[in-house]
Amino acid sequence: MRTLRRLKFMSSPSLSDLGKREPGAAGADERGTQQRRACANATWNSIHNGVIAVFQRKGLPDQELFILNEGVRQLLKTELGSFFTEYLQNQLLTKGMVILRDKIRFYEGQKLLDSLAETWDFFFSDVLPTLQAIFYPVQGKEPSVRQLALLHFRNTITLSVKLEDALARSHACVPPAIAQMLLVLQGVHESRGVTEDYLRLETLIQKVVSPYLGTYGLYSNEGPCTHSCILEKRFLRRSRSGDILAKNPVVRSKSYNTPLLNPVAEHEAEGTASGGTSIRRHSVSEMTSCPEPQGFVDTPDQGPSGTFRSSPSPHSGPCPSRLYPPAHSPEQGPDHGSPPTSSPETLVDQILESVDSDSEGIFIDFGRGSRSSVSDFEAAGGRPSVV
């Protein structure tokens, strides 16, 4: 029993002992906290000085980028890491942009355009990559360091100088860097969506880029167009041809109930006088075609061999729905006074116009074979099938 009581009193310290130990422990914790804060402040100061030196065109010494990276990593692990974004915006970026703006703040006209273009080149080529390298451990958080830097450049420099007045001058020469700056800045959005500052930026872009598709429609030199994009007239050969192509013509018959070709009827022709051979013929009734212009068309001529002879067909008028020009007829030569060959563009226009003017439909004429080809085929003793 005495042993148990002794162990009990030894294991549980008295209140007086707790009171004696508390001031020493609290003091040690406080000293540790102060040391950590002092170290964090020193790290903040080194990062601040390094970033400001970049904006002042002083650059970073050797191995300084590695030291700043390690400092950012250490800060993110402390309780100050949660305030990193606020500190970056309110302290580092704001001071840096003011340094860049003060050099061009009171410029106007062409001098402002040239100075702003040079400032943008320096910021976009040197400052922005260096900031992304220094704060590389912060990647993955939104908004990113790149977005924050570009937004501060837009609000502190681009929208605060007299850029709109400089662009409105009649003989203003806009450097390419100005157009690049505006287009890069218009690709950065805030979490709140479209803001008043973003709309002000779009008004500047309209003076440099035309046509420009903005938040509220398409803008061009002629004025705003709130509908879809418009193709320039020079890209359309002719409006009439475009309308014809848009109609999408198809091959159709005179009536939707009557097909273009009636069913084919087969019959055996009687044997010829020479060899008694029979030829299978296919007859087509009510096939619509166009008359040949001063040409030759195949017409049936019942002979002893059951073949078709070529005979001239009288000209009964032009056919508007022909799919080939009459000037290229094989029977017409240069002595017949035919017009010269048209250009491909004019030829296509004539075909499209004839297609559009034909209310009955498009009919294809296959009867353009020449007399010599038929005669040679008969002499070869072939077995033609006639349609």
Curated annotation (Swiss-Prot):
GO terms for cellular component: TORC2 complex. InterPro entries: Bit61/PRR5. The modification Phosphoserine is found at residues 253, 373. Residues 310-321 have a biased composition (Low complexity). The keyword Transcription regulation does not apply. Residues 10-96, 189-219 are annotated as: Interaction with RICTOR. Associated subunit of mTORC2, which regulates cell growth and survival in response to hormonal signals. mTORC2 is activated by growth factors, but, in contrast to mTORC1, seems to be nutrient-insensitive. mTORC2 seems to function upstream of Rho GTPases to regulate the actin cytoskeleton, probably by activating one or more Rho-type guanine nucleotide exchange factors. PRR5 plays an important role in regulation of PDGFRB expression and in modulation of platelet-derived growth factor signaling. May act as a tumor suppressor in breast cancer. Associated component of the mechanistic target of rapamycin complex 2 (mTORC2). Binds directly to MTOR and RICTOR within the TORC2 complex. PANTHER family: PROLINE-RICH PROTEIN 5 (PTHR32428:SF4), TARGET OF RAPAMYCIN COMPLEX 2 SUBUNIT BIT61-RELATED (PTHR32428). This is Proline-rich protein 5. It comes from Rattus norvegicus.
